């Protein structure tokens, strides 16, 4: 696998392709990220690269983290992320990972936390159909049957019910990179990504590439 990059979701916009079709896109402020640790099979048992992103006040970083970050540079970083790689040859501690690592037409996998929607009902959380709204019905947004009675006498684990919705980590795979802006550290990808504007994202080359991507 290749080294990924951390970024921040700025928001959504749209592009128009050569045929005049509107294409929804997401603008991501990606990097630059500093390589804070290089793991090798000799020392750690596997190959990986840890990168850091985002400024942070010194008083918010504990002493062990400060000592760890000082090995790769003077600036403290808010977020750390480790990426498994096949080999760490040519990777230097303290060097930067920028959006130049990606190119238009490339497919990427974007990971992040989905927007939290709080305690939600059956229709919103699971897409259940509602009951009749008229003719004396009192079952508008109720769940319906949740199982049998005396036997089994309980609710089976995994039963879809109301509860907390969102706020979970997810990965959107195979998004196409449409534009790379090296001067402003911007990455424009086709489609939507998890989270609200300002959310932390992890972008890495797609694991499953498939056919050649087209904008």
Curated annotation (Swiss-Prot):
It comes from the Bacteria. The keyword Kinase does not apply. GO terms for cellular component: cytosolic large ribosomal subunit. GO terms for biological process: translation. Keywords: Ribonucleoprotein, Ribosomal protein, RNA-binding, rRNA-binding. One of its GO terms (molecular function) is structural constituent of ribosome. It holds the Pfam family Ribosomal_L3. Residues 124-164 are annotated as: Disordered. The keyword rRNA-binding applies. Part of the 50S ribosomal subunit. Forms a cluster with proteins L14 and L19. One of the primary rRNA binding proteins, it binds directly near the 3'-end of the 23S rRNA, where it nucleates assembly of the 50S subunit. Belongs to the universal ribosomal protein uL3 family. This is Large ribosomal subunit protein uL3. It comes from Synechococcus sp. (strain RCC307).
């Amino acid at each position: 696998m290749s080294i990924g990059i951390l970024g921040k979701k700025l928001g959504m916009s749209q592009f128009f392709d050569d045929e005049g079709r509107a294409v929804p896109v997401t603008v991501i402020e990606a990097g630059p990220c500093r390589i804070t640790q290089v793991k090798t099979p000799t020392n750690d048992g596997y190959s990986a690269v840890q990168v850091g992103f985002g400024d942070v006040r010194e008083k918010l970083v504990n002493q062990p983290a400060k000592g760890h970050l000082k090995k790769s540079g003077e600036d403290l970083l808010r977020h750390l992320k480790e990426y498994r790689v096949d080999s760490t040859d040519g990777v230097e501690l303290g060097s930067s990972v920028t959006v130049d690592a990606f190119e238009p037409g490339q497919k990427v996998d974007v990971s992040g936390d989905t927007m939290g929607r709080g305690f939600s009902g059956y229709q919103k959380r699971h897409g259940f159909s509602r009951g009749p709204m008229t003719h004396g019905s009192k079952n508008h947004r109720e769940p319906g049957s949740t199982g049998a009675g005396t036997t089994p006498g309980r609710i089976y684990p995994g039963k879809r019910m109301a509860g907390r919705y969102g706020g979970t980590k997810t990965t959107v795979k195979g998004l196409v990179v449409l534009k790379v802006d090296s001067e402003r550290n911007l990455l424009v990808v086709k489609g939507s990504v998890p989270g609200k504007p300002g959310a932390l994202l992890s972008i890495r080359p797609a694991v499953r590439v498939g056919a050649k991507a087209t904008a």
